[in-house]
Amino acid sequence: MKRFLVTLSLAFACMAQAEDSAGRLARILAEKGILTNDELANIERAGADEAVRLLSSALYQKGILTQSEMARVYGPAAGAPGDVRFAPGVATTYVPAAAVATAVVPTVPASPPQTATSPSARTTQIQELTTASHFPMQIYGTVLWNSFYNTGGSNIEDIPLVASKRGSDPYSNFGMTVRQSRFGLRYQGGPEVWGAKLSGNVELDLLGGAAPLANGVGMDLVRLRLAYGRMDWKNTSIEAGQDWTVFSPLNPISLASFAIPAMSTSGNPWIRSPQFRFEWHSDATQAARVLLQMAALDPNVGDNPTTVVDARTPGIGERGRGPAVESRLAVTGKIGERDATVGLSGHYGRGDNVGVLNGVTVARPVDSWGVNLDYTLAVSKYFTLAGEAFSGRGLGLFSVASGQSVLAVGTPGEHGVLASGGWAQAQFNLNRKWQMNLAYGLESDEGSNLITGSRGKNQTYMTNLMYKVSPHFTWAWEWRRLMTNYQNQQSLNAIIQTANMAIAYVF
């Protein structure tokens, strides 16, 4: 009976004309303990069509809906192009990590194509996918094609983040790639353990490098993004595995920077790292919802060799003989009927920078620390403002002062390079199909910690336009202006422009 009533309610939500029907239903289910705060927050941030999809997915994962019942809710017109909305722009660790940094990827797999005249259009039974241990499982992914044009040299041709020194590579370049595509497995809904609901995620992309062959550019290697398991009680959760960090959880919206978050090295600290995490959140019915997260992480400070290696060797962070620690406190309230979230997070790790001075091996202490403020303000259904501001030292793991976050023993940056910055993005939902984003990011490294030739400042201006043809097909265009300054080498400061066109197929 419970399953029937929820299915009937979802069908009503799909037919209702009011934009917040699914949101109201989600709040009722949260009050009854069927939905978690995380799931409710994700649904409330979505538009009408996407909210129904997220709600259906959550109920399917909990075993309340079967896939055949989901098909009855959606009907043959589930992906009708006239009823498409973008999910709001910036994902945080407050929502399931599989959705992080991808505001255009729905969380419900597409139903098989059906024609209106097909005799099975209303009665098709969809076989559920399960693991060997009988966990319900979803396969998801995004096949992403990018074409790009750069007016000058950069650190990464297809995902440029930093402009090369003036004169080092003055030639423009063009190319295409699919290596930002990603694929994953998500499981949730099996038997409870100690009263907790189990879930997990494994996600891969193709940014692990290119094959060492003359024609190996298109033979991209697999890279691990996510691999974690969770246990969720009513108000608390624990997680172990590789996931997005608690520190600095937001990312700008971009299909040009899908594998490496936009504004990386321009004010956006980010990383996915092995960790053990604890979370507590207040009840969804409270006017102001509170989320507290604490985590112990792998102590890496971002000094891993850039060449391919077969074994891990101790680095600066590992020599600190203990984990790094992080925490984040976030409060979510309302602006009218929409969520507004402000969070404050911190990171600390201890390490030893080992080097040779005058023929003697010495160690210099490195305190890797950071403080970050994040905000997501959904002012209206047409406009959302989001961003971050940070300050810290030795944050190379987060692509802050990347490649120069801790310099060699005997140099000014031997204890770690101090850096600060931030980014902001204005998201405009023009209608159900079109979305435009304007963003700016800045990272400034402390000059007294640097050596000549290091990057002193990096700025990025970005705008993109996205056309969501359907929930499973998006077309996007993006332009960026990169401005990179080099320490004590002003004549080598560089500016490049980059343009990108992307086509995303979501399944």
What are these regions (language model features)?
Residues 1-4:
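Positively charged n-region of N-terminal signal peptides that target proteins for export
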Residues 9-17:
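Hydrophobic h-region of N-terminal signal peptides that target proteins for export
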Residues 467, 493-507:
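Outer-membrane beta-barrel "beta-signal"
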Residues 320-322, 327, 332-455, 459:
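Detector for outer-membrane/organellar transmembrane beta-barrel domains
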Residues 152-158, 211-220, 250-257, 302-317, ...:
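Outer-membrane beta-barrel translocator domains and adjoining extracellular loop/strand segments
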Residues 16-156:
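N-terminal periplasmic/intermembrane-space "pro-region" immediately following the signal or transit peptide
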